[in-house]
């Protein structure tokens, strides 16, 4: 299935039904009172996050989604039926924005999360509501309210723990296929990857994490060059970036250090928060480098690149160094989760302390 990560749709809720201006008519009751029922509520348009859906392709071709109108009220105190709601199932990770106002309506980050995109109009009142001691035969009724109508932009930001950065043909697809269940297209030419790939890495029976591979970046990507700029947003939810560098490019005129710096510059120009994410350097294709030259080449790269963060040396093709990298990633992600859990627990601790102080004050009084 083709991966579609952006779509524009129109959500149109149903109009409320009109109230009825009706009077009771029965034999021997010539002056029956008002009995006009209310109109039904218009149907609403909802979105629900579904982890079984991976793309927005359905919304690329079906752009208008219209809920039913509420039925009009009738006599004999009959209320109109409510219009049927419609539910749009979207991938987890979908960001929904109102195109007219720029308001972010929802960020679907959890399976089953439900949000209203367009609310149906309220039904109008029948003349039954207008009866009073001075107006025994009211002819007033209220029309139903129109339903909401919204133009919406859908953006899919995949939910991954780790994101892969790198130039085209750096070996990202080979790496993700070696460590996970993902099977992206792998070939010896640039831009083999044309859309994001997700892979689940199982460390053991109980622990796993998700890796996202996006098309390779080139210089000028932040301004729209190449393919990768279209998919950089998929890295915004990750907790760790792996910058994969081809340590032994086929073209000897290519400088890996210059390419690595170009990637980082594009990242910074695109999004400062993405640039500030934890980032590890992964030097790939060691199998192509003679063993007696590896240490010197790695040392030279780090020196010229002026890198002070974590460095891993791997061969995505043979698997050399991949196991150590996987366990390091697992430890890093566990540390992040522990910090988040501790941060969430801190307010509870402060609240307990305040309650304890209040109890002590009451005891002294």
UniProtKB/Swiss-Prot annotation:
The encoding gene: obg
Name of the protein this chain belongs to: GTPase Obg
UniProt keyword list: Cytoplasm, GTP-binding, Hydrolase, Magnesium, Metal-binding, Nucleotide-binding
Assembly behavior: Monomer.
A GO cellular component entry from the record: cytoplasm
Role this protein plays: An essential GTPase which binds GTP, GDP and possibly (p)ppGpp with moderate affinity, with high nucleotide exchange rates and a fairly low GTP hydrolysis rate. Plays a role in control of the cell cycle, stress response, ribosome biogenesis and in those bacteria that undergo differentiation, in morphogenesis control.
Compartment(s) where it occurs, according to its Swiss-Prot or TrEMBL record: Cytoplasm
Major subcellular site: cytoplasm
Residues where Mg(2+) binds: 173, 193
Domain (Obg): residue spans on this chain: 1-159
Cofactor: Mg(2+)
């Amino acid at each position: 299935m083709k991966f579609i990560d952006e779509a524009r749709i129109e959500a149109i809720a149903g109009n409320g039904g009109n109230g009825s201006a009706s009077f009771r008519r029965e034999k021997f009751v010539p002056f029956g009172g008002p009995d006009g029922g209310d109109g039904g509520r218009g149907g609403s348009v909802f979105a629900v996050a579904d982890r079984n859906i991976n793309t927005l392709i359905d919304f690329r071709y079906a752009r208008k989604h219209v809920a039913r109108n509420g039925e009009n009220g009738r006599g004999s105190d009959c209320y109109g039926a409510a219009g049927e709601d419609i539910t749009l199932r979207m991938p987890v990770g979908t960001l929904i924005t109102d195109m007219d106002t720029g308001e972010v309506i929802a960020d679907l980050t959890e399976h089953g999360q439900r949000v209203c995109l367009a609310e149906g109009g309220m039904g109008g009142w029948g003349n039954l509501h207008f009866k009073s001691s001075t107006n025994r035969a009211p002819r007033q009724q209220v029309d139903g309210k129109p339903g909401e109508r919204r133009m919406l932009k859908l953006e899919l930001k995949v939910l991954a723990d780790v994101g892969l950065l790198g130039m085209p043909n750096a070996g990202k697809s080979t790496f993700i296929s070696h460590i996970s269940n993902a099977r992206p297209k792998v070939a010896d030419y640039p831009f083999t990857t044309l859309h994001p790939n997700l892979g689940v890495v199982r460390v053991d029976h109980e622990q796993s994490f998700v890796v996202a591979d996006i098309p390779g970046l080139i210089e000028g990507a932040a301004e729209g060059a190449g393919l990768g700029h279209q998919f950089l947003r998929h890295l915004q939810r990750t907790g760790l970036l792996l910058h994969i560098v081809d340590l032994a490019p086929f073209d000897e005129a290519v400088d890996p250090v210059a390419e690595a710096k170009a990637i980082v510059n594009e990242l910074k120009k695109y999004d400062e928060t993405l640039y500030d994410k934890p980032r590890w350097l992964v030097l790939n294709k060691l199998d192509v480098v003679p063993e007696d030259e590896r240490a010197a080449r790695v040392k030279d790269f780090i020196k010229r690149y002026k890198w002070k963060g974590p460095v891993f040396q791997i061969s995505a093709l043979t698997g050399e160094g991949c196991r150590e990298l996987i366990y390091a990633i697992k430890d890093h992600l566990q540390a992040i989760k522990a910090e988040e859990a501790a941060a969430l627990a801190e307010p509870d601790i402060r609240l307990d302390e305040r309650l304890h102080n209040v109890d002590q004050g009451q005891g002294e009084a």
